[in-house]
Amino acid sequence: MNVFDGSDEEDNNPFSGTTHLYASGIAAVTDGPDDYDFTEPSINGSSDENAQSNAVAEPIEETDEPAEEIDDDTLQTWRFASAELSRSSAFETSYTNLLGQGKNPEVIRIVDAGQYRDIYGKYAIGYKIEFGGIVVTRRYSEFDSLRQSLCRLLPTIIIPPIPSKHPIIKYLFNPLHAKKDIKIIERRQRLLSRFLNNCHKVREIRNHIVFQKFLNPEYFWKEVLNTPPISILPMNNLLAPPLNPTKPSPIHLLLPTPTVLTMRKHEQLIGRNDVMEIKFADYDSDLIRYKAILQPLNKTVRSIRSNIQTYSAVLSELGAYFNAFSLENSVFQVSALFEQMNRLSMGIEKTGQAIDVNYVSAEIFSEAIMISLEEGSKEMLQFIHEAQRVLHFRNFKQEQFYTIETTIKKRKDRIRELKEADLQAVRLGEALKLNAEESPTVAQVMDSMTRKSANKNHTDKQIMGLFRSSASPNNKSGSDSISSEVEPHLLTKDERVVQVNKLEKELEKLNECFKLIEKDLQQVNESMDNSLNNLEKYFHEKWFLIFRELAHNITSWLKDCSESWKNAKQSIDSI
Amino acid sequence: MSESGTLTNKESDTKILSVLVSDPQKQKTHSQTYITYQVSTKIDGKDEPNCVVRRYNDFVLLHQILINDHPALLVPPLPDKKVLNYLSGDRFSHSFTQKRCRSLQTFMRRLLSHSELSKSRILETFLTSTDWDVYRRSLTGQISTSEVSDVLINAFKHVNRQRDEFVEIKEKSEKLDHNLSHLDKLFHKSVKRVDLIGQNLKKLQSSLSGLQELCCDEKELSNSIKAFNDGTMQLIDSLNDLNKYVDYEYNVDIKDMINYIEALKQLIRLKDQKQIDYEELSEYLTRSINEKNNLLSGYGSGNYFKSKLEELAGINQEMARRDKIAKLETRVQSLTDEVEKSKQVADEFEKEVLKEVEQFEQIKTLELKDSLAALAQKHIDFYDDMVEKWSKIEERLESA
């Protein structure tokens, strides 16, 4: 672990001044970071910093009073009843009981949505989540922050999507209102419930403490956001263990940070003929093709839905006019036709009823299309977007890998060059020595050469010192400073030795990094492969579900309409 | 020439059972292009239907003759000339000729359902005779179409007294007209929507085909998509057929009904016209009688100045008075006759029109029944067919 030995810097802790677990040094943290089970006292030390950074991140929340000062009367009774008394309690047991039921499609339900008073006494739209008999209410913004946290906590996992935010401008003019926006709230209720269940299907999320806390009414969500693991998330996930970014790992900080500009082209990587590489390239192109199909599909479905809605509105009007028509369909009462005309009225009325039934079932049908196909394809598109984001993370990891690999190669080459130059110099020296014995001119030149090199040696030491400090270990890629580019035979022997030593030391660290990134990459590959596979499976199941639902809805729509027209026909035939 | 035989022998009682107007065909001669329709008539006692080919102008001629011959009868209207379609050159389009064919069919059916008009000889000629062409050539341009202007002149005059029945009829026909035109508009809207839905479904289908290609490794899923897509295809086709029916036939029926009511209103206006004639005449008569009575009772006619003037002019007042009375006498006499006559005409017309209204009710009821029944049947056929197909698809998908 002693990467930093030999360095002259006293405090090179990159975490200092951040909210990272290591902010006050590695020793301050006990081992066993694999489980996230941090108890509250352990964060007391850094809670001040947390408060500050969170105040910056969420300025809106700033005005809220701290939870402790809230009068018990303002709390929602059904939410916090006896919660504080038994914090460990029933939830954990029921959660573990339910963990086994991961296969069940609807383990988590959102049973209600509507206005409620949050713990700070503010009115907001809350979603009542029921899970294993335990109920917790969360707001949309809390779902949103849960998702964002999960994305950062599990960078290799495709995190299920949630419905997109209400457009901010709309919100400013017309904030969500429990009574007015029933449609939007219902839709969110449905989609958020889908989100929770999709999360629950993913083992990594299901078992994650943050997700569990979200479902647990005993935790205030704001508190969860301000405590580990969320509060100790690293600034850059690329410089942390990919499967567990909050796990401390100093070597990760030595990794290069690739930017979009320095990214290699995909084709170059595929050229390496790596099995994994090809597989992931396939994933990538599949996702793009999928997206190219889903995007127009989603658009078409939207317009089908809206056309059916308009159609059903026309039908409803039509039904109304048939009704009026049934009352006023004759210009004159002919006594001989009295009976027949009565029946005609009946027939017209029944036709109107048939059209009314058509209207209602068209309405239902359009709703069904919206829920299954429109929202389904939208969700898939969001999923694809997520998958692409995750793949992007992998590309960065990949880039880290290649950067280190090439750097190692460069360093090795350089060492070899330097050593070769050494050998050459020895040979040259011997040759010159032989010559010098014969020629005084050569001897003079040699003399001046050694003196010069001694001078140079002196200045070089300064350069070397500067290099050491400037080429700090975390930008290895940029460490090809001027002196190392100098042609080896222009350096003195001593310089060469110093460089070789330095390079070998660097190489040592690089090799360590390489091992790490190799492992990282393997983990990333494995985890993502798994996640993408699951996504593919999920898509397939989803399609089956969608087609089944649609076919069912189409059939029942057709059946209803057929029935209604048969009724009408009977009545018409009796005219 | 067997047709001409039946023509000359009017009493032979060729009973026409039904008429079918069908098969619009585009005809091209050197000078003009037009559409012909096949008119086939089923005659009692004959197996083979009798077929003739007529064009729209022939129908117009027939219609005109019938109107002129039977002013008191409700002659069913023809579909509009649709000048706009002529201008846009759309009159040879499939949808236009199909719709017109349907309207012409309705026109013929209404004629045949009418107790008087169905016996008309000219109709029989139109339906059966090859002589019709000769008829047409000699008659075209000779028939006046004057009644329109009459109606216009009296458009602002109203009948003073009319029977309660007609008040009711007028009111109700307004309402019926109103309802029907709304139905017409709404059906148009629905046809347009369904058309759009069909187009959308086509797009959806092609998207799903793309998906199927993408998932071709997954046999089951790809089969499901195919099953679904096949069903969608059938849905699109049948929906299209149903929509065509509503557009080409049901909607045309509604339009024709609206026109029929319009013709009825026209007839009632004509009746009002007769009534107005009578009312004006009798008013004139009353005035004349009053004037005569005034003269007889010796109260000076006109004013003082007038009599003074006449005195100065050397006219013998007494003589002039007698003269006037005599003139009024004859006028009253002839007016009384006229009023009597016009009252008879108006009453006759009124009776006739009431009968026509009854006939209209009968024909309308039958027609509405038929078109509703056909509408319902088309829907039932569509839905049943689709239910059957989609139930199978549902099963296939369930088992996947």
UniProtKB/Swiss-Prot annotation, chain A:
Q: Where is this region: Disordered?
A: 30-66, 467-486
Which UniProt keyword terms apply here? Autophagy, Endosome, Lipid-binding, Membrane, Protein transport, Transport
Location in the cell reads: Endosome membrane; Endomembrane system
Q: Where is the composition biased (Polar residues)?
A: 41-55, 469-484
**Family per record:** Belongs to the sorting nexin family.
Which membrane topology describes this protein? Peripheral membrane protein
Domain notes per entry: The PX domain binds phosphatidylinositol 3-phosphate which is necessary for peripheral membrane localization to the perivacuolar punctate structures.
The protein's GO terms of the molecular function aspect are:
phosphatidylinositol-3-phosphate binding
Q: Can you list the GO cellular component terms from the UniProt entry?
A: cytosol; endosome membrane
Q: Example GO biological process term?
A: autophagy
Q: Which Pfam families match?
A: PX (PF00787)
Q: What is this protein called?
A: Sorting nexin-41
Question: Which organism is the protein's source?
Answer: Kluyveromyces lactis (strain ATCC 8585 / CBS 2359 / DSM 70799 / NBRC 1267 / NRRL Y-1140 / WM37) (Yeast)
From Swiss-Prot, chain B:
Can the keyword Cytoplasm be found in this entry's annotation? yes
Q: Which residues bind a 1,2-diacyl-sn-glycero-3-phospho-(1D-myo-inositol-3-phosphate)?
A: 55, 81, 100
Report membrane topology: Peripheral membrane protein
The record's section on InterPro entries has: AH/BAR_dom_sf, PX_dom, PX_dom_sf
Reading the lineage from the top rank, the first entry is Eukaryota
Could you state a single Gene Ontology molecular function term? phosphatidylinositol-3-phosphate binding
Q: Which GO terms describe its cellular component?
A: cytosol; early endosome; endosome membrane; phagophore assembly site membrane
- State where the protein is found: Cytoplasm, Cytosol; Preautophagosomal structure membrane; Endosome membrane
Q: Give residue ranges for domain PX.
A: 15-134
Please name the GO terms of the biological process aspect recorded for this protein, alphabetically: autophagy of mitochondrion; endocytic recycling; piecemeal microautophagy of the nucleus; protein transport; reticulophagy
Q: Report the coiled-coil segments.
A: 319-356
Q: Which Gene3D superfamilies match?
A: Arfaptin homology (AH) domain/BAR domain, Phox-like domain
Domain notes for this protein: The PX domain binds phosphatidylinositol 3-phosphate which is necessary for peripheral membrane localization to the perivacuolar punctate structures.
Entry similarity comment = Belongs to the sorting nexin family.
Summary of the function given for this chain in its UniProt record: Sorting nexin, involved in the separation or division of vacuoles throughout the entire life cycle of the cells. Involved in retrieval of late-Golgi SNAREs from post-Golgi endosomes to the trans-Golgi network, for cytoplasm to vacuole transport (Cvt), and autophagy of large cargos including mitophagy, pexophagy and glycophagy.
Q: What is this protein called?
A: Sorting nexin-4
Source organism per entry reads: Kluyveromyces lactis (strain ATCC 8585 / CBS 2359 / DSM 70799 / NBRC 1267 / NRRL Y-1140 / WM37)
Gene field: SNX4
